[in-house]
Structure formats: C-alpha cells, structure tokens
C-alpha cells in the first residue's frame, strides 16, 4: 500500500528500482515462477480492475488496483508478485486485515502511528509489525506467542 503524497510517483520509482536492483543479483528467475506470476495477474484481472505496472523484467511483477477488494488475500502469489493500492489513510486498509494476516511490513511510519492505527481499528490479526526487510526475521516472540514459555516443559514433583 502506498500513502497518497505529492511525491508518490517518484517514491514508487525509487523504491521499485532499489527492489529490482537488489533482487536481480540475489535471485535466479525460474521459468515456472514467471508463469506463476503472469497467471496470477490474469486471474486477478479476471476478477477486478487492475493495471500492469511496467518493470525491467519479471523479477518483480506489479499490479495496480483500482479499488481494494475485501478478499485481496485470495490473489496472493509468491516469488515477487505485488498488488499495489494507494490510500489516503492507513485506516482504508483496516477492512481487509483479518486473522489471516500475521505480519505487517512497513516503511516510512513512526511506531506511534502504527500503534494508533491498530488500536483505532481494533485489528485482531496482526501479531508483528516490522520494517520491510525484517518480515521473516526470527524472534523468540512469534505470531504473538512467547516461544520459550510455549515450548518449555516444566515437570512437577508433588
């Protein structure tokens, strides 16, 4: 999701150029992944109004949504497929955040803005809110559970 701003297009260009530059050197694009991405785009286009966003190649595939459907998670695709939607406020994404969502990756927000967003909208699905690039970083608190407490066996002797 992008937050509406007068510099939005420049921010998108800068962000996606950096993502592409990083990914093209770290990942080998496989034919099956390219097919999965184009299939995901056509499937999404069959159900909603989307625009294909030009990229240098298929390392990252972007679709720009005209509106945000409540079932957007049904159109997820792995390996670098991104659905983008521009909002005026974070509150616009609240209706899609269900218990299926565990982690929210962010960039450019202050911690207190995100805490207020979660509290104001009473979001129940999010267990972790972390900067982009840290969404898969392992921690001892995972999906809202303290793993030490969860996996520690404490025998009792009476």
Please give the residue ranges for each predicted region.
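NAD(P)-dependent aldehyde/semialdehyde dehydrogenase
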Residues: 1-105, 112-123, 129-156
């Amino acid at each position: 999701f992008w937050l509406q701003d007068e510099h939005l297009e420049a921010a998108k260009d800068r962000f996606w150029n950096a993502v592409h530059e990083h990914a093209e050197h770290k990942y080998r694009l496989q034919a099956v992944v390219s097919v999965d991405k184009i299939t995901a785009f056509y499937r999404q286009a069959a159900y909603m109004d989307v625009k294909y966003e030009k990229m240098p190649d298929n390392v990252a595939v972007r679709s720009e949504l005209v509106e945000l459907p409540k079932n957007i998670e049904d159109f997820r695709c792995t390996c670098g497929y991104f659905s983008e939607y521009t909002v005026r406020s974070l509150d616009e994404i609240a209706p899609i955040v269900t218990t299926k969502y565990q982690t929210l990756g962010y960039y450019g927000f202050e911690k207190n803005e995100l805490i207020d967003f979660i509290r104001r909208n009473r979001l129940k699905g999010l267990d972790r809110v972390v900067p982009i690039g840290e969404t898969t970083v392992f921690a001892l608190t995972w999906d809202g559970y303290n793993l030490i407490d969860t996996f520690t066996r404490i025998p009792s002797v009476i």
